């Protein structure tokens, strides 16, 4: 379907095609003539870091708001949207509306993987805290520049940080 992309970390179907994160890019691919090869190949975002393998961009996931969420990774860079500067990212995650391609920063900025529950509450993780709840979503924090929130995420794992991890691969 697609060749010459390095290290894809996430795939999310949309509108007959797929969004793919392959650090340092977010792509959109679509087959328009039925030959099982992507005829549309768009580089949507670029600039994600590749320096820390446990914290590269990843995790395309639909939210209840019909936006796609993903971890931007911990590599601070200024992202380029279709070749033009978008905004710098550091310890945040992102979401975007796939119809308008409007991007926003969201609370997170941890490592690999995240999820939403049935009520839209977002959970993130890192290698030392395997389950954290996003308590203060960025879209609410940015409404009041005078509100200083501490602890944007909280640890919710019953067994605490640094719980045993068991491989499922050989």
Regions found by a protein language model. Name each.
Residues 1-170:
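Beta-propeller domains with acidic blade repeats across secreted/periplasmic ectodomains
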């Amino acid at each position: 379907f697609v060749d010459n992309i390095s290290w894809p970390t996430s795939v999310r179907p949309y509108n007959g095609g797929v969004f793919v994160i392959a650090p340092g890019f977010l792509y959109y691919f679509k087959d328009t003539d039925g030959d099982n090869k992507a005829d549309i190949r768009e580089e949507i975002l670029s600039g994600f870091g590749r320096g820390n393998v446990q914290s590269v961009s990843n995790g395309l996931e639909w939210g209840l708001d019909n936006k796609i969420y993903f971890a931007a990774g911990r590599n601070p860079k200024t992202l380029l949207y279709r070749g033009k500067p978008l905004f710098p990212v550091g310890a945040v995650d992102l979401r975007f509306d796939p119809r308008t391609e409007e991007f926003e920063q969201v609370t997170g900025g941890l490592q690999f993987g995240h999820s939403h529950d049935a009520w839209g509450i977002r959970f993130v993780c890192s290698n030392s805290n395997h389950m954290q709840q996003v308590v203060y979503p960025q879209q609410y924090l940015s409404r009041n520049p005078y509100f200083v929130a501490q602890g944007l995420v909280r640890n919710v794992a019953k067994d605490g940080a640094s719980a045993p991890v068991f491989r499922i691969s050989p």
